Amino acid sequence: MRILETERLILRHLVPDDLDHLFALYSDAETRQYFPEGTLTYEETKEELEWFLNGHPEHPELGLWATMYKETNRFIGRCGLLPWTIDGRTEVEVAYLLDKSYWRQGLGTEAAQAIAQYGFEQLHLSRLICLIYRRNQASVKVAQNIGMTFEKEGVDEVGPFLLFSMHKQPSSI
């Protein structure tokens, strides 16, 4: 089921047939270089996909979605909205991970912008964040490009991160 569409991308629900594509993404060391847990095995990828297929028990409207390159209908990544608890508060992250052959084309920004708009307009969220490993300057740039600003450094169960955030802008009506 299609969730979002941009000029060059389609974001849709993940399906079991996405497993091999997701594994190709998750098993690539360069693509996963900023994830503290590193690459994932096929079984770990399968478990993560099953978790996303089942939906978050408290936030079923959130999750990661297959990211398809519209021109070729090729699976090029996974993006979406993820719930986190930070400092005792529930936050929603704009998350994005694209196949490295699609980097440096503005696709991360295009996906993140559409996801943020969806979060604000369709889900009526008032705040969105990005959690970024401090050396991941490409993700920092994506967050800044969609209007997020640096808020703080932090550490969670996965490791150290930079927290960027943005708030829903009041309607001009």
Each model region followed by its residue ranges:
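Acyl-donor (CoA/ACP) binding surface of acyl/acetyltransferases
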Residues: M1-Q33, E50, L62-I173
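A short gly/proline-enriched turn/hairpin at secondary-structure junctions
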Residues: R32-L40
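Active-site rim helix/loop that mediates acceptor-substrate recognition in acyltransferases
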Residues: T41-P60
